[in-house]
Amino acid sequence: MKQWIRVKKALLLSLILLMAWLLPLFQWNGTVLSATAISTDYPAQLMHLANKDSTKILTANGTSDGAALSLQTLGSDLSASWRFDRVGSDGNGTFFKLVNAQSGRLLTPRNYNVSDKTDVILYGSESAQSQHWYVVPVKQDHLGNDLYYKIVNYSDISLALTQGTSGMTLAKYSGTDNQLWLLNADGLQGFAGYCFDG
C-alpha cells in the first residue's frame, strides 16, 4: 500500500512539473509569431531572359569585363543564365543587379553611360547605380499572370534593354518586340506548373 502511495505522489509530481513546463506554450499575450524562412542560404533561382517568342536567350559572349551580349539559342553552359540580386526598392519598384552565372559579371551600360543607344555589356560589380535594373511587367497572359517584362535602367527608367543590330543597347522604351522579355526559370523552380484541363 505504501508503494502505491509513493507511485501516486511521483505521478502527481511528474504531472505538475509537466504542466508547469507546458503551460507557457499555451498562453497567448496577443503577439503573433512571424514566419521566417527555414534557411537563408537557399540557392537563388537562375533565370533565362528570352526574347518575346522565346526562340533565343540573352547570352554573354565571354566572361571578361567588356564582353558583348547577344541573343542565341540555348547552349549547354551557364552563359545564358542570370541571377537577380535584389538591391532595394523605391517608388519605381524593386531593383536588381542582373548577374551572369557563368562569369559573375553584371549587365552594365558601357562606361556606365546611361543614354540612348549606349551598348550594354558585362562588367564586374562596381556598385554603380547604372548597374541596377528594374524588371517591370508590361503584358499579361489570358489568366492575368505577368508574361512579358521590360528591363529598364535605374538611372533612367525611360531607357530599356533592347536587342540592337549588333548586340544589346539602351533605347527609349516603346514596347516593341525587341524590348519585351520572358523570364524563364533555368531548371526546377518548384512543384507547380500549367497543366492541360483536358
Identify the meaning behind each predicted range.
Residues 9-28:
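Sec-dependent N-terminal signal peptides of Gram-positive bacterial secreted proteins and lipoproteins
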Residues 1-7:
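N-terminal secretory signal peptides that target proteins for export/translocation
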Residues 30-198:
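Lectin-like carbohydrate-binding module/patch detector with strong preference for beta-trefoil
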